């Protein structure tokens, strides 16, 4: 019985690890970014007031785009003339569980 329990325990551990390594992606306006990257974007935008003041109330994303902490999958957004609007939309989408289809109760997923 103990011989069978070890492979089952290992398989269960691998399944848990595999689930934790899968990322949730957000697709918007031709961009595909990780949910974790959008959460990092939120963190960058919630830095002290002096940073937000330099951001020009988020209308000019050049300060954000020059930040080395900006995740690499968000950097292509910086090349778009609508970068500020795209960043705003990504942040909005990331806060809606049904938009992400991660909530089983949501319809249309």
Swiss-Prot record:
Record flagged with keyword Disulfide bond: yes
One CC-aspect GO term: extracellular region
Domain of life of the source: Eukaryota
GO molecular-function terms, A-Z: guanylate cyclase activator activity
Cysteine disulfide partners in this protein: 65-78, 98-106, 101-109
Residue ranges listed under propeptide: 24-94
Signal peptide bounds: 1-23
Subcellular locations according to the entry: Secreted
InterPro entries, A to Z: Guanylin, Guanylin_sf
Family: Belongs to the guanylin family.
PANTHER family registered for this protein in UniProt: GUANYLATE CYCLASE ACTIVATOR 2B, GUANYLIN FAMILY MEMBER
Protein name (Swiss-Prot/TrEMBL): Guanylate cyclase activator 2B
Organismal lineage: Eukaryota, Metazoa, Chordata, Craniata, Vertebrata
Gene designation per UniProt: GUCA2B
